[in-house]
Design a protein with these regions (language model features):
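Short coil/turn segments at beta-strand junctions that form active-site/ligand-binding loops
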Residues: 102-103, 141-143
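Active-site flanking residues adjacent to catalytic metal/cofactor-binding acidic residues
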Residues: 7, 34, 147-149, 164
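N-terminal, active-site-proximal structural segment of metallo-dependent hydrolase catalytic domains
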Residues: 1-49, 53-54, 63-66
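Single conserved hydrophobic/aromatic residue that forms the stacking wall/gate
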Residues: 156-165
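Structured beta-strand-rich core segments of catalytic domains in phosphoester-bond hydrolases
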Residues: 36-114, 118
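A long, amphipathic alpha-helix that forms part
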Residues: 123-142
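Acidic/histidine-rich, metal-coordinating catalytic segments
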Residues: 142-155
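Active-site-proximal beta-strand elements of phosphoester/diester hydrolases
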Residues: 2-11, 103-116, 147
């Protein structure tokens, strides 16, 4: 069994203690992170290495960015969705692992927020992104695990966290 955790960390360098707590409590094989908010050049390798993980990151300074920490070394890593309009936002990373059951792709994404259905730019961008990632996944010829911050709610009437006590 593979134990996978997906976590919007909202700033990797600010929350290594949360990763330590996740590792201690759940002992995951893979941690998929969103909103790492650190460029590839400034990525702190000590954070995953101190936890016993290999790391694969695709980020930029200050916002967005994704990473996969894994105990095993993947056979392949893909950063981005092949040159689309989202590439400057660093929203997708994929690591492929060879297992006893064949190749498994861990696909990790920080999906666009979209604002609301009537927003003239953000919602159409979100719709295009979902179509692109769906097309990408449909073209994979192996098992997948899709992780990430999907930026969706189950029901349109779901309350905002600000409205909850």
């Amino acid at each position: 069994m593979i134990r996978i955790i997906s976590f919007n960390i909202n700033g990797l360098r600010a929350r290594p203690h949360q990763l330590e707590a996740l590792k201690e409590k759940y002992d995951p094989d893979i941690i998929a992170l969103q909103e790492i908010k650190v460029s590839d050049e400034d990525f702190p390798p000590n954070i995953p290495e101190d936890l016993g993980f290999n790391y694969y990151n695709y980020g930029q300074k200050g916002f967005h960015g994704v990473a996969i920490f894994s105990k095993e070394i993947p056979t392949n890593t893909i950063k981005g969705l092949n040159g689309g309009e989202d590439e400057n936002q660093k929203r997708y990373i994929q690591c492929d692992f060879s297992t006893n059951h064949g190749l498994v792709s861990i696909c990790n994404s920080y999906f666009p927020q979209g604002e609301n259905r009537k927003h003239p730019d953000k919602f159409p961008y979100k719709d295009r992104y979902y179509k692109r990632i769906t097309n990408h996944i449909d073209n994979l010829n192996n098992s997948i695990v899709l992780t990430g911050d999907f930026n969706i709610c189950l029901l349109y009437t779901s309350p905002s966290p600000r409205d909850l006590d």
